[in-house]
Amino acid sequence: MYPAFLEQSEIDGTVWAIPDLASARAMYYNKDILDAAGVEVPTTWDELKAACEKIKETNPDVYPWGIDMTTDEGQAAFSYYTWNNGGGFVDENGDWALNSDKNVEALNFAIGLVNDGYTNSDPANETRYDLQDMFGAGKVAMMIGPNNIPTYLSDGGYDINYDVTTIPANEGCDSVAMGVCDRLEVFKDDSAEDQEARTAAISKFFDFFYDDERYADYMVFEGFLPTTQTAADLLAKDDDTFASWIDILQSCNFYPATKTEWADVKQGVIEVEQNALLGDDVQTLLDDLQADIAG
């Protein structure tokens, strides 16, 4: 089991549920567009910005980079940039740290890509679905999206030469992906007289469910990613493109969605992004949000 996913079910040192399936976000890129521009796949922010510049010079009709700062998923954009700059929603103690220096730097970098003309023209209104359509049509060279994009592109009749990789991070920072997982949880019936038999049956079910081949086949059928390393390795043997997801799954971070203020934070970071797109100061916006949330 990938530790990052198992930790999402842990409260006060006790694991209360088992992750049964996962999804994650990674960077998709159009191989032909990057090749035509003569750029390597970017792994750092400096490389990303340089790649955007070359792509724009080579093919001005293509948006080098896709950004979604809409009310649909603007909080995801916040995570993509802040996590990959060593920041994020909370600090190492789990306290809100929305206006950290790293977060300010991260959002200024993202807004800078927009202001430099390297992104889709309307990030406040163009959702990730719009970006996926643009990517499929060859109008966006690179974007961050979920693991079901291949299915989305296939169902939409798109035919492009693309690949997936880790999200670019600032120099000196590790790449971090956004993870999502569902969980299985079994409740104990204290009134039942056959506790040992019930426990044995539950164990038998989990052994059956997480059998490597069976579990891997189930993930393929459902279109999700496995939460176990062994199933991921098994899938990677049969699908070279899946090998990229092993590194991505190991790097996942998650929204602090269990914190009571999360709904307000989610809406708040979207408003920060959209006001920053209009020219407001990122530091001031995040300071105000931090004060509203944490006092």
Place the predicted regions along the sequence by residue.
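Short, solvent-exposed loop/beta-turn-alpha elements that line the ligand-binding surface or hinge
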Residues: 1, 40, 64-69, 87-107, ...
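Hinge/lid segment of periplasmic solute-binding proteins
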Residues: 1-25, 40, 49, 77, ...
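C-terminal capping/gating helix-and-loop segments adjacent to ligand/active sites or protein-protein/ligand interfaces
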Residues: 10, 222-225, 243-293
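Short helices/loops that flank or line small-molecule/ion binding pockets
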Residues: 33-34, 53-57, 129-143, 278
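Extracytoplasmic/periplasmic substrate-recognition and gating elements
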Residues: 36-37, 116, 155-222
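Short helix-initiation/N-cap motifs at beta->coil->alpha
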Residues: 45-49, 122-136
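Glycine-centered hinge/linker elements that transmit conformational signals in sensory
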Residues: 52-54, 95-124
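Paired acidic/hydrophobic, glycine-rich loop segments that form the ligand-binding mouth/hinge
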Residues: 141-146, 163
